[in-house]
């Protein structure tokens, strides 16, 4: 008799994705982040569902409903802290996952990569609308500032902003629809994740050498299922440690003050994981230019496969591009720092240089270095 997991219509799909999947024998811990992102998504949906049971999306009660969750609901404080800090870990994993893709040339699986970029945009949208829900000062003003950027769209800008607001300012209608979006989007993300995996399993995983690994495959289970389990344990220990010992470390103190349209906080800034993009937005004096730069700071990832010039796939044996990659990492860290600083000298010029370098690395230096390394190989 054949094994049920190989014949059952539903089980064989799971089997082909999680048990009998042939995986390269040499994939490192950098290949763990995909499954960790899956774990993050499941954790966020689970904690979010329990929060939604007690949350009210009305400006009169939203702030106090969050306080009520933390004070009166059984383990509500824990669920809320896990959900808020889970978002941070989600983005840590996303950025490491993207960094791995850039380093090892995984972006040459174009469909998988492009679905991944769409996933990043969806997660960013979800995090943004979610941050508005507690209706604190930074929630309100963050929503006001970011939605206002759409007014830079020529001709239809103002109508667009009022349409999204549901009125002439960020108000009750805005909060209600943001809650609806925040509830809906994670399920769209889950669906897009399935598509992401579907495309990945058409080609199989890349590996640290960037060479074809068909001759050296091992089954996903038990080898990588247990390796993933170790990653799960590390992530969950880190998340619970942060949520239990220092839950407000990454939050903004301004969000402990209920939203007040009459008082603007001294420094309006998003959560840490958006600061690099916020710095790029602010570094351009023109409103429309800033909005386009903000959009392109993420969409530039879609150009990476097109701009790949090297004959080799990964950066494992490419010292020049390796240097550029780590320059990019340092640049994003600098942008993150600048995004959290006030708009004054010397932060303005540092932000502008870092923003220019960000795009210059992606669009000019990396393709050039790839071409140069090809030439060096021809000469040697």
From Swiss-Prot:
Q: Where does a ubiquinone bind?
A: 201
Q: Where in the cell is it found?
A: Mitochondrion inner membrane
Record SUPFAM superfamilies: a domain/subunit of cytochrome bc1 complex (Ubiquinol-cytochrome c reductase), Transmembrane di-heme cytochromes
Which parts pass through the membrane? 33-53, 77-98, 113-133, 178-198, 226-246, 288-308, 320-340, 347-367
Q: Name one Pfam family in it.
A: Cytochrom_B_C
- The residues the record assigns to binding heme b b566 are 97, 196
Query: What highest taxon heads this organism's lineage?
Result: Eukaryota
Cited CDD domains: cytochrome_b_C (cd00290), Cytochrome_b_N (cd00284)
Main location per UniProt?
mitochondrion
In its keyword annotation, does this UniProt entry include Hydrolase? no
Positions annotated to bind heme b b562? 83, 182
Keywords, sorted A to Z? Electron transport, Heme, Iron, Membrane, Metal-binding, Mitochondrion, Mitochondrion inner membrane, Respiratory chain, Transmembrane, Transmembrane helix, Transport, Ubiquinone
GO molecular function: any one? ubiquinol-cytochrome-c reductase activity
Membrane-topology descriptor: Multi-pass membrane protein
What are the GO cellular component annotations?
mitochondrial inner membrane; respiratory chain complex III
GO BP of this protein = mitochondrial electron transport, ubiquinol to cytochrome c
Q: What role does it play?
A: Component of the ubiquinol-cytochrome c reductase complex (complex III or cytochrome b-c1 complex) that is part of the mitochondrial respiratory chain. The b-c1 complex mediates electron transfer from ubiquinol to cytochrome c. Contributes to the generation of a proton gradient across the mitochondrial membrane that is then used for ATP synthesis.
State the remark under miscellaneous.
Answer: Heme 1 (or BL or b562) is low-potential and absorbs at about 562 nm, and heme 2 (or BH or b566) is high-potential and absorbs at about 566 nm.
Q: Which family does it belong to?
A: Belongs to the cytochrome b family.
Task: Report the PANTHER family cross-referenced here.
Answer: CYTOCHROME B (PTHR19271:SF16)
Q: What is this protein called?
A: Cytochrome b
Q: Which organism was this protein described from?
A: Dactyloptena peterseni (Starry flying gurnard)
The organism's lineage? Eukaryota, Metazoa, Chordata, Craniata, Vertebrata
- The gene from which this protein is expressed is mt-cyb
């Amino acid at each position: 008799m054949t094994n049920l997991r190989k014949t059952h219509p539903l089980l064989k799909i799971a089997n082909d994705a999680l048990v009998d999947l042939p995986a390269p024998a040499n994939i490192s811990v950098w290949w763990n982040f995909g499954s960790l992102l899956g774990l993050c998504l499941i954790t966020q949906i689970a904690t979010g569902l329990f929060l939604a049971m007690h949350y009210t999306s009305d400006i009169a009660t939203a702030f106090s409903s969050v306080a009520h969750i933390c004070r009166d609901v059984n383990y509500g404080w824990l669920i809320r802290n896990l959900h808020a800090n889970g978002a941070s870990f989600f983005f840590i994993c996303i950025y490491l996952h993207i960094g791995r893709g850039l380093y090892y040339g995984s972006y040459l699986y174009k469909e998988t990569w492009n679905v991944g970029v769409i996933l990043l945009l969806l997660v960013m949208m979800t995090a943004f609308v979610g941050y508005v829900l507690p209706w604190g000062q930074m929630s309100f003003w963050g929503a006001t500032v970011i939605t206002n950027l759409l007014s830079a769209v020529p001709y239809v800008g103002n109508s667009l902003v009022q349409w999204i607001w549901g009125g002439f300012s960020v108000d009750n209608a805005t909060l209600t629809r943001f809650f609806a979006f925040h509830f809906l989007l994670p399920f769209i993300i889950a669906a897009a994740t399935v598509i992401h995996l579907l495309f990945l399993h058409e080609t199989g995983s890349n590996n640290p050498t960037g060479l074809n690994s068909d001759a050296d495959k091992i089954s996903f289970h038990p080898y990588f299922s247990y390796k993933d389990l170790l990653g799960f344990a590390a992530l969950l220990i880190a998340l619970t440690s942060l949520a239990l010992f220092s839950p407000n470390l990454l939050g903004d103190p301004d969000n402990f003050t209920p939203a007040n349209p009459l008082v603007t906080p001294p420094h309006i800034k998003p959560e840490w994981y958006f600061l690099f993009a916020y710095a790029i937005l602010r570094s351009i004096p023109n409103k429309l230019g800033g909005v386009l730069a903000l959009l392109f700071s993420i969409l530039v990832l879609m150009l990476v496969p097109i701009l790949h010039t090297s004959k080799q796939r990964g950066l494992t044996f490419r010292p020049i591009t390796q240097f550029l990659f780590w320059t990019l990492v340092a640049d994003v860290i600098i942008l993150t720092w600048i995004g959290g600083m006030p708009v004054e000298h010397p932060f303005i010029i540092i932000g502008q240089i870092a923003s220019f370098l960000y795009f210059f690395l992606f669009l000019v230096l990396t393709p050039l270095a790839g071409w140069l390394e090809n030439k060096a190989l021809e000469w040697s």
